[in-house]
Each structure stands twice: as C-alpha cells, then as structure tokens.
C-alpha cells in the first residue's frame, strides 16, 4: 500500500510534488486522498480524472473517493435518548401540551429525596430548561431531564397508565435497586 509518508516528494510543497502526483495512477491518488482525509490533513492539490469507464469496455471503474463530508459525519455518532417514551405517554403529553395553559411549556423530569426508599420522581412544567439539563425529543414531544437526575434516569422507559382508580406516568428504570412497598419511591445502584 502506498503511504504518503514513505514518498519524499509528498513531504515538500514544490513543483516536484505536483509532477510526482501527476505520474501516479488514479488508484494511488485516491488512496493518498483517503489517507490525508483520515489523518485530518488538508486535501491534496491535484485534480482527479473523471471516473467514467473507458470506451474499450473494460468495465472496471476506480473506487469512489471518500469525501470530506463523509469523513466528518463519522466523527460524531448520534447519542441514544436518556429516556424513551411509549406511544401512550407521547399521546397523553401531546394532549396536555395542547391545552391553553400549557402552551410553550415542557415537562421536566427530576429526582428528589422523598419516601421510604429515598428517592422519587418529580414532574413539573417549566418554560425554559436549566443550563445543563438534557432535552429529549421523540415523536414531536420535547421533555427535559434534570441534570442531577441523569444518572438515575438514564435508560428508563416512561409509560402512561389510565385505569379505574388513577391515571399516572409509570417509569421502568433499569437502575433501580429497590422500591418501597407502595411503589412511590426507589433507590438506585451506586
């Protein structure tokens, strides 16, 4: 494999470098461009010939060059949401946010010291998130997770239940170590 560091002509910026690059095959030029982009260097100053198949009908074409945009898109991988919402929870949140008194407000999920087991979920509507709060967007709904609750809530699933006695949000949290008898409070793994 051709390495750009093994060729002395590529280390200097001179006319000799351009002459050397013009003598390279198309495959070698594409390899050099890929190496330079991968290593974070600027692209090479050489024009790549068109990649049309020859008229002789050889049928082989050079590989497609990797663009700077493709390299940049692999540097940052999308993150998973801190909390997932079930379709019932999304539907109920949309109904709540469509009411006149809740326009422009978002639900903020937090954890506070309360109950037999030590911690309980707190839900409140706010207009503006705090500086380090996490905003979760799913199915057209935006909710906020308080920064102090991120470690306790991460990986949870939020559901909505409406039965004969009560209607409430239910959290399925993989970080819970134990819950109290009534189910209102919990303790997490440390």
UniProtKB/Swiss-Prot annotation:
Metal-binding: is it a keyword of this entry?
A: yes
**Which InterPro entries does the record associate with it?**
Fe-S_cluster_asmbl/transfer (IPR050322), FeS_biogenesis (IPR000361), FeS_cluster_insertion (IPR016092), FeS_cluster_insertion_CS (IPR017870), HesB-like_dom_sf (IPR035903)
Give the start-end ranges of region Disordered.
49-71
Any GO CC annotation of this UniProt entry: cytoplasm
List this protein's GO terms for biological process. Answer: [4Fe-4S] cluster assembly; iron-sulfur cluster assembly
> Which keywords appear in this protein's UniProt record, sorted alphabetically?
Iron, Metal-binding, Mitochondrion
* Chain residues that bind Fe cation: 116, 180, 182
Which Pfam families does the entry mention?
Fe-S_biosyn
Which superkingdom is the protein from?
Eukaryota
One GO molecular-function annotation for this sequence? 2 iron, 2 sulfur cluster binding
The cellular location(s) given in this protein's UniProt record come to: Mitochondrion matrix
Q: Main role?
A: Involved in the assembly of mitochondrial and cytoplasmic iron-sulfur proteins. Probably involved in the binding of an intermediate of Fe/S cluster assembly.
Q: Its family? A: Belongs to the HesB/IscA family.
Protein name as catalogued: Iron-sulfur assembly protein 1
Q: Which organism is it from?
A: Schizosaccharomyces pombe (strain 972 / ATCC 24843) (Fission yeast)
The organism's taxonomy opens as: Eukaryota, Fungi, Dikarya, Ascomycota, Taphrinomycotina
């Amino acid at each position: 494999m051709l390495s750009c560091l093994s060729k002395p002509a590529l280390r200097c910026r001179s006319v000799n470098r351009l002459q050397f690059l013009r003598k390279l095959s198309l495959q070698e030029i594409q390899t050099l461009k890929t190496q330079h982009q991968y290593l974070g260097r600027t692209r090479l100053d050489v024009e790549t010939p068109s990649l049309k198949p020859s008229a002789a009908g050889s049928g082989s074409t050079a590989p497609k060059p990797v663009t700077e945009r493709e390299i940049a898109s692999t540097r940052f991988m999308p993150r998973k949401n801190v909390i997932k919402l079930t379709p019932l929870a999304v539907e109920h949140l949309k109904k709540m946010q469509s009411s006149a008194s809740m326009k422009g407000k978002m639900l903020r999920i937090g954890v506070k010291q309360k109950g037999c087991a030590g911690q309980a979920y707190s839900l409140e509507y706010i207009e503006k998130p705090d500086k380090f709060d996490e905003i979760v967007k799913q199915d057209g709904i935006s909710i906020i997770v308080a920064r102090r609750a991120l470690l306790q809530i991460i990986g949870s699933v939020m559901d909505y239940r409406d039965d004969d006695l009560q209607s409430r949000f239910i959290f399925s949290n993989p970080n819970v170590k134990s819950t109290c008898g009534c189910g209102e409070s919990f303790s997490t793994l440390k």
